[in-house]
């Protein structure tokens, strides 16, 4: 969401990628879309939830900016409460995101990187650094 202060800027994302890091896409609606007035508290009767396509849009944008090697998912299932996108309410619904990414032309290898491969790569690098320093 442009202008949402908790999202990283393009320059921050580029700096992260230049150091080999991975941006984890958050599933909270406020991070994905500006359809709700952020100055108001969450009201279940009026809240408009993001969609799986909004998550995929964020993935697309990050991949276009810094490449597939620097994008992952960090759902924040335990932190955003009932602001999760329609179709991504828990891990059992990941096939919805996978299907959307496939429809957008992502390969199996790319999807594996997004779903955890990139994070695992960075984790291995951190462990190796810790062992050697």
Language model region names:
Residues 1, 30-34, 79-82, 120-122:
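Flexible loop/turn segments at secondary-structure boundaries
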Residues 5-21, 53-69:
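Histidine/acidic residue-rich metal-binding segments in metalloenzymes
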Residues 26-27, 66-88:
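Short acidic/histidine-rich active-site segments
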Residues 20-28:
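A conserved active-site cap/scaffold subdomain adjacent to cofactor or substrate pockets
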Residues 89-133:
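Mid-to-C-terminal alpha-helical segments outside catalytic/metal-binding sites
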Residues 23, 76, 111:
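Conserved, mostly hydrophobic/aromatic
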Residues 35, 43-52, 81-88, 101-113:
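Outer-membrane beta-barrel pore domains
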Residues 1-9, 40-49:
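Glycine-rich tight-turn/loop motif centered on a GG-T
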């Amino acid at each position: 969401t442009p202008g949402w202060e908790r999202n990283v800027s393009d320059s921050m994302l580029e700096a992260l990628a230049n150091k080999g890091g991975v941006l984890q896409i958050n599933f909270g609606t406020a991070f994905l879309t500006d359809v709700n007035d952020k100055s108001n508290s969450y009201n279940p009767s009026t809240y408009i939830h993001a969609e799986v396509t909004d998550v995929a849009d964020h993935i697309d944008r990050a991949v276009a900016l810094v490449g597939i090697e620097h994008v992952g998912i960090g759902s924040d299932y335990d932190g955003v409460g009932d602001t999760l996108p329609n179709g991504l309410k828990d891990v059992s619904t990941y096939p919805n995101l996978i299907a959307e990414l496939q429809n957008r032309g992502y390969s199996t290898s790319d999807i594996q990187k997004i779903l955890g491969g990139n994070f695992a790569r960075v984790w291995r690098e951190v462990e190796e650094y810790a062992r050697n320093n």
